[in-house]
């Protein structure tokens, strides 16, 4: 969430900056004034509580003095009792006022960076880079889609997966499992060489911690709830969530920064808002593996923006190593999630549909997440009036099943699929996956038959 001081003109800040950011997000501008009003109400109640406490201390001293003089203090004692009651009631008002303020504050997104293209429609994301040579079907070879290629190679069993796990369930099988592990091992090795520390996080999180890492809408549309003895928990939708909370309630000394983590995990998503989109094959599924870059920097100068460029370069170098054509887009302001000040997507080329599709999202969340999680910058000082928070960034390296789909389409041949050279050492030296089933083609009557 944002720093409440940004809403306070008396602190030398300009709330109009927040209003403008909200306009860029196509979100409520009125909420800024609502927060300013709630903040004033909360501080007024807090002032009243402080006044009660000062009065209580004053009365207590009077009681002590009267007792020393062995004089009657009963009237003053009655006043202290009334003060306690009034103070308790006012403290309840303070808690209520703060809860209302915090609830509103959490609805305001991060400040949108000036370089973000302002638009509401993702169709207008700004293309900033193209890499690689796009492949197209030729008269001699009609390129197949990833759904058909998975079936022809026999690398996943979606029929039995759906029978056992429900819609979009699947088994990775044989070379499919090996290819998935090859991507994981290549990705982790790739990041280790770039100074990243590997972390495999828990696959579920406590609700109170998840609430500090995920938006409210994600609980309904994305997260699976795990019930059992004790507190409710939620399955992670990305390693970003547990990595985000890894340093919760800690102070991080400047000498420790930057921190670079390579999170590897299975991920679980309900995908409630994606009915009818990519429901076949293994492109958009409820359970998948992902390697996530997660980095923490200091809040000063351009440290986090330089890290954003570094993380984006890592992703580009990874897909260049796989020789998959891609484009980089800057996401429009209206499509940013609340935490992101700026976000890039890397979209790779899928030849069968002749379109680019998202494989990577890379965001700078500045101090928005760290403030909620109380991950502070520097070292604790007893006399410090203001706290600084670290900046946190996240980026996909590879969601492996989705990357496999892209590899299959770009590396297909008439009789199978080549294995990218960088993955071959992780595949026992295999260089080619032959089709195990015969391709399906249309016969002269328009019906499908085996070739």
Curated annotation (Swiss-Prot):
InterPro entries: aa-tRNA-synt_IIb (IPR002314), aa-tRNA-synth_II (IPR006195), aa-tRNA-synth_II/BPL/LPL (IPR045864), Ser-tRNA-ligase_type_1 (IPR002317), Ser-tRNA-synth_1_N (IPR015866), SerRS_1_N_sf (IPR042103), SerRS_core (IPR033729), tRNA-bd_arm (IPR010978). Signal peptide: none annotated. Its EC number is 6.1.1.11. Catalyzes the attachment of serine to tRNA(Ser) in a two-step reaction: serine is first activated by ATP to form Ser-AMP and then transferred to the acceptor end of tRNA(Ser). Consists of two distinct domains, a catalytic core and a N-terminal extension that is involved in tRNA binding. Homodimer. The tRNA molecule binds across the dimer. This is Serine--tRNA ligase, cytoplasmic. It comes from Arabidopsis thaliana (Mouse-ear cress).
């Amino acid at each position: 969430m944002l720093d409440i001081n940004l809403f306070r003109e008396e602190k030398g800040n300009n709330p109009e900056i927040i209003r403008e950011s909200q306009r860029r997000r196509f979100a409520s501008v009125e909420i800024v004034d609502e927060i300013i009003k709630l903040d004033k109400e909360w501080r007024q109640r807090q002032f009243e509580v402080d006044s009660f406490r000062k009065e209580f201390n004053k009365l207590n001293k009077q009681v002590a003095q009267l007792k020393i003089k062995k004089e009657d203090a009963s009237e003053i004692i009655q006043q202290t009792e009334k003060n306690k009651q009034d103070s308790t009631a006012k403290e309840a008002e303070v808690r209520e006022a703060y809860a209302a303020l915090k609830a509103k504050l959490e609805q305001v997104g991060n400040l949108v960076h000036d370089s973000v293209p302002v638009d509401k429609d993702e169709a207008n994301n700004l293309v900033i880079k193209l890499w690689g040579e796009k492949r197209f079907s030729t008269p001699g070879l009609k390129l197949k889609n990833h759904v058909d290629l998975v079936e022809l190679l026999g690398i996943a069993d979606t029929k039995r997966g759906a029978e056992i796990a429900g819609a979009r369930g699947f088994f990775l099988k044989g070379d499919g499992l090996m290819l998935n592990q090859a991507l994981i091992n290549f990705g982790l090795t790739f990041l280790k060489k770039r100074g990243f520390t590997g972390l495999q996080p828990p696959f579920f999180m406590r609700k109170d911690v998840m609430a500090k890492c995920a938006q409210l809408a994600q609980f309904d549309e994305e997260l699976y709830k795990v019930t059992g003895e004790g507190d409710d928990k939620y399955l992670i939708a990305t390693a970003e969530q547990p990595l985000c909370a890894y340093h919760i309630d800690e102070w991080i000394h400047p000498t420790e920064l930057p921190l670079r983590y390579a999170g590897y995990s299975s991920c679980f998503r309900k995908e409630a808002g994606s009915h009818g989109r990519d429901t076949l094959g293994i492109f958009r599924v409820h359970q998948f593996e992902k390697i996530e870059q997660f980095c923490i920097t200091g809040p000063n100068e351009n440290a986090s923006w330089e890290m954003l460029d570094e993380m984006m370069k890592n992703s580009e170098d990874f897909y260049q190593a796989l020789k998959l054509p891609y484009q980089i887009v800057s996401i429009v302001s209206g499509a940013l999630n609340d935490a992101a000040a700026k976000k890039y997507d890397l979209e790779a080329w899928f030849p069968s549909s002749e379109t680019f599709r998202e494989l990577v999202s890379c965001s700078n969340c500045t101090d928005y997440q760290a403030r909620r999680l109380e991950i502070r910058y520097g070292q604790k000082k007893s006399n410090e009036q203001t706290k600084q928070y670290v900046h946190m960034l996240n980026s996909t390296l590879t969601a492996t099943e989705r990357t496999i789909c892209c590899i299959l389409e770009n590396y297909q041949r008439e009789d199978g699929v080549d294995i990218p050279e960088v993955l071959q050492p992780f595949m026992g030296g295999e260089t080619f996956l032959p089709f195990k089933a015969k391709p399906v083609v249309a016969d002269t009557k328009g019906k499908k038959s085996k070739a």
